[in-house]
From Swiss-Prot:
GO molecular function (one): tRNA binding
Coiled coil: none
Described function: This is one of the proteins that bind and probably mediate the attachment of the 5S RNA into the large ribosomal subunit, where it forms part of the central protuberance. In the 70S ribosome it contacts protein S13 of the 30S subunit (bridge B1b), connecting the 2 subunits; this bridge is implicated in subunit movement. Contacts the P site tRNA; the 5S rRNA and some of its associated proteins might help stabilize positioning of ribosome-bound tRNAs.
Cross-referenced InterPro entries: Ribosomal_uL5, Ribosomal_uL5_bac-type, Ribosomal_uL5_C, Ribosomal_uL5_CS, Ribosomal_uL5_dom_sf, Ribosomal_uL5_N
Pfam families linked to this entry: Ribosomal_L5, Ribosomal_L5_C
Lineage: Bacteria, Pseudomonadati, Thermodesulfobacteriota, Desulfuromonadia, Desulfuromonadales
Gene3D superfamilies: 3.30.1440.10
Gene Ontology, cellular component aspect: ribonucleoprotein complex; ribosome
Gene name, Swiss-Prot/TrEMBL: rplE
Protein name: Large ribosomal subunit protein uL5
PANTHER family: 60S RIBOSOMAL PROTEIN L11-RELATED
GO biological process annotation, one example: translation
Organism: Pelobacter propionicus (strain DSM 2379 / NBRC 103807 / OttBd1)
Protein family: Belongs to the universal ribosomal protein uL5 family.
Length: 179
């Protein structure tokens, strides 16, 4: 079992149950999935960027990426409907917990001048989105093989009903929030 999942079952569930006084154990919020998205506008001119981004995202997450395509045409960006413009990965179960563990304990502390992540990036329904400016903070990425620095969005989807519950869940799991 993943280390973070063990922590969730042993400690976090009891803490959340006492903090929010849930009547049923099934009411306790849990992490449903983690979506890692890399949007690449430069892929319009150079499709090779998308291949390297997909390979890097697969190395970071340990799962095959899905190429995302443009939903509609935008003439000012020279974008046609159906053109590949990014890649994403949806993590669930064991890979999700392992990725979150590596993100919170290894990757985020490697960010320059890291003081913690913002506690305000919740969407109103308990889900948390985190933006990362460069993929080099992940130890799986070889610094010499990187052709261009690319950022990514990481969305942690929880079953929490409010932001307060979602924040408590992530805080107890070890997310380094800024004070």
């Amino acid at each position: 079992m993943a280390r973070l999942k063990e922590i969730y079952h042993k400690d976090v569930m009891q803490k959340l149950r006492s903090d929010f006084s849930y009547a049923n154990i099934m009411e306790v919020p849990k992490i449903v999935k983690v979506v890692v998205n890399m949007g690449l506008g430069e892929a319009i001119q150079n499709v090779k960027i998308l291949d390297s981004a997909a390979a890097e995202l697969a190395a970071i997450t340990g799962q095959k990426t899905v190429i995302t395509k443009a939903k509609k045409s935008i003439a000012t960006f020279k974008l046609r409907q159906g053109m590949p413009i990014g890649c994403m990965v949806t993590l669930r179960r064991a890979k999700m917990y392992e990725f979150l563990d590596r993100l919170m304990n290894v990757s985020l502390p490697r960010v320059r001048d890291f003081k913690g992540v913002s506690a305000k990036a919740f969407d109103g329904k308990g889900n948390y989105t985190l933006g990362i400016k460069e993929q080099l903070i992940f130890p799986e990425i070889n610094y010499d093989a990187v052709d261009k620095i690319k950022g990514m969005n990481i969305t942690i989807v929880t079953s929490a009903k409010t932001d307060e519950e979602g924040r408590a869940l992530l805080k107890y799991l070890g997310m380094p929030f800024r004070n």
